[in-house]
From Swiss-Prot:
GO biological process, one term: adventitious root development
Classification via SUPFAM superfamilies: CheY-like
Entry keywords, A to Z: Cytokinin signaling pathway, Phosphoprotein, Transcription, Transcription regulation, Two-component regulatory system
PTM sites of type 4-aspartylphosphate: D68
Keyword Transcription (UniProt): yes
Inducing stimuli: By cytokinin.
Family: Belongs to the ARR family. Type-A subfamily.
Encoding gene, per UniProt annotation: RR1
Name of the protein in its database record: Two-component response regulator ORR1
Described purpose of this protein according to its UniProt entry: Functions as a response regulator involved in His-to-Asp phosphorelay signal transduction system. Phosphorylation of the Asp residue in the receiver domain activates the ability of the protein to promote the transcription of target genes. Type-A response regulators seem to act as negative regulators of the cytokinin signaling.
Domain Response regulatory positions: 9-135
UniProt note on tissues of expression: Expressed in mature leaves and flowers, and at low levels in roots and shoots.
Length: 231
């Protein structure tokens, strides 16, 4: 089900506030031109409640689920299986994210029905992959449709490799991926703060002028100013 005027409603599921903020900033940026409407929750259980998968006959309110893999209580993989099992008539596209590029984890999710697997942090080049997995786009991956092992797009270098490849590339550092996400948030904040720099500079000059005037008045009252002028 596609939102009005071509807007894809995305349910973002991630227990990390930083990672949620990164995705929200990216999908709400001018580059996306209003293509996405993001609804964020911090757990898989809240996602289940929002989707109404526990209530028979309740209509879906979103077009796509973008979920983290590692979460407490209920993982993204378990959420993926629940969505695919409980909504067979109206399948919801599910994209899994993880800060670890592990081929076994990717293969596990793809075999469970995930439309894609993206390594964190989400980047602008990944937006097109989300568009391809939109219900209105028929180009989304159809894993195993030809009876062959699914081809996985490893998000670290965006090179298509076979899931059975023997020599996978080394996984990126989870800490490095987290820092990259923090850096994206800080960059966005710095852009917003840059508009206030001229006002801050004028305020500092005004304070400095007031301090100088106060010092002159203090010297005048003590007679120091006249002595300095006569000398």
């Amino acid at each position: 089900m596609e939102g009005g005027r071509g807007v894809t409603r995305v349910l973002l599921v991630d227990d990390s506030p930083v990672d949620r903020r990164v995705v929200q900033l990216l999908l709400s940026s001018s580059a996306c031109a209003g293509s996405f409407h993001v609804i964020a929750v911090d757990s898989a259980k809240k996602a289940m409640e929002f989707l109404g998968l526990k209530e028979e006959g309740k209509e879906q309110a979103i077009d796509m689920v973008l979920t983290d893999y590692c979460m407490p209580e209920m993982t993204g993989y378990e959420l993926l299986k629940a969505i695919k099992a409980l909504s067979p008539l109206k399948p919801i596209p599910v994209i899994v994210m993880s800060s670890e590029n592990e081929p076994q984890r990717i293969s596990r999710c793809m075999n469970a029905g995930a439309e894609d697997f993206i390594v964190k942090p989400l980047q602008s080049k990944d937006v097109q992959r989300l568009r391809k997995c939109s219900p209105a786009n028929t180009q989304c991956c159809d894993a195993g449709s030809d009876g062959k092992p699914p081809l996985l797009l490893l998000p670290s270098d965006h090179v298509v490799v076979d899931a059975t490849a023997a020599s996978p590339p080394p996984p990126p550092s989870r800490r490095r991926a987290h820092f990259a996400g923090v850096a994206m948030v800080l960059h966005s904040s710095s852009v917003e703060l840059s508009h206030y720099f001229p006002f801050l500079f004028k305020f500092i000059l005004l304070v400095y002028a007031i301090l100088c005037l106060g010092e002159l008045l203090h010297r005048w009252s003590n007679g120091c100013f006249l002595n300095l002028w006569c000398a």
